[in-house]
Amino acid sequence: MEVIKVTGAIIYERNKFLICRRGPNEKAAGLWEFPGGKLEINESLENCILRELKEELDIDAELHSLYDNYSFKAKDTIYDLYFFRVKGFSGNLSKTVHDEIKWVELKDFHNFSFLPGDAPVIKKLEKDSKIW
């Protein structure tokens, strides 16, 4: 069974989280997710999420810490997911891959259809709501 390492970013500002909708030409088009992507060969997890944020949103981010890590199985693939808290970023958010970007309060997440693999981190965010 194939194992793919994927990083995601938890970006929080002014009581809202940044979420992105997958574009029409992407797998799982129309579903919402936290920005991020797949680890490349010989790349660290930290460098992966920083690269993905630059590629997907055209921002330079500063990481705070690893927030959550778990595995998710979809068909014949296991995804090892690593979500990092972002301390801050510079640059203007751009839509290079996603067709929509939104700042959303945690209490409103139920109004969005997320990738199934994001469900565990969303539950953790809700459980940890006092730290946000």
PLM features: residue spans?
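Active-site-adjacent beta-strand/loop module that shapes the phosphate/pyrophosphate-binding cleft
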Residues: 60, 70-92, 102, 108
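Conserved hydrophobic "DFG−1" position in protein kinase catalytic cores
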Residues: 11-12, 19, 88, 103
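Conserved Nudix-box catalytic region and its N-terminal flanking loop in Nudix hydrolases
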Residues: 16-55
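Short secondary-structure junctions
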Residues: 56-63
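Generic C-terminal helix-cap and adjacent flexible tail
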Residues: 1-2, 126-132
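Conserved N-terminal beta-strand and adjoining loop/helix that marks the start
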Residues: 1-18, 38
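NUDIX/MutT-family hydrolases
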Residues: 85, 94-125
